[in-house]
Design a protein with these regions (language model features):
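Tryptophan-anchored aromatic micro-motifs
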Residues: 32-51, 67
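C-terminal motif of bacterial Sec signal peptides marking the signal peptidase cleavage site
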Residues: 21-24
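Edge beta-strand at a domain terminus
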Residues: 83, 133-147
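Hydrophobic/aromatic beta-strand elements that line small-molecule binding cavities or substrate pockets
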Residues: 52-55, 86-91, 113-120, 141-145
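Bacterial signal peptide processing site
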Residues: 26-28
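N-terminal glycine/threonine-rich, aromatic-flanked beta-hairpin/loop signature
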Residues: 50-93, 134
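Bacterial N-terminal signal peptides that target proteins for export
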Residues: 2-14
Length: 147
């Protein structure tokens, strides 16, 4: 009797797991996620960050963006543009999840991995949620294919 009950519950969990697995990546192009692993991409500017150009080659992701620094002088406050290039290691767990790790971290926060979940794929882009380390901070955005 206990075995029957166990198998019934086990079967329900297995079916539930398979349904969740199938629904976990909301996309019309599920089989075409490989096209995001190599190439040149863009993340548009958002609240708190500037437009970022991303180049993926093998296991590296090279990011270029402008960082603004405020400089105070006697005649006023000025914004200085600095072009920043960061190199990160990228490791794909599957077509919908990858981890980024700074090649040369400059701060303690840079040492934490960035976990990225692809939530939705379209013809020329994907929506993602990124989480830094094991913090509760999450950032959502969209990556567009450039080349």
């Amino acid at each position: 009797m206990k075995n029957k009950h166990f198998y019934k519950i086990s079967s329900i969990y297995t079916i539930l797991f398979l349904v969740l697995l199938l629904l976990s990546c909301n996309s019309d192009n599920n089989n075409d996620a490989e096209r995001f692993k190599l190439g040149i991409f863009e993340i548009p500017a958002g609240k708190g960050y500037s437009k970022t150009t991303v180049k993926r080659i093998d296991s590296l992701q090279i990011e270029e963006y402008i960082k603004y620094t405020e400089i105070s002088t006697d005649s006023g406050v000025f914004k200085k543009e600095n072009k920043v290039i960061d190199t990160l290691y990228i490791k794909w767990k599957n077509n919908f999840f990858y981890t980024l790790k700074m090649k040369s971290p400059k701060t303690e926060l840079d040492k934490d991995p960035i976990f990225v979940q692809i939530n939705k794929i379209t013809k020329n882009s994907y929506d993602f949620t990124a989480k830094i380390g094991f913090s509760e901070f999450k950032q959502k955005g969209t990556v567009y294919i450039i080349e």
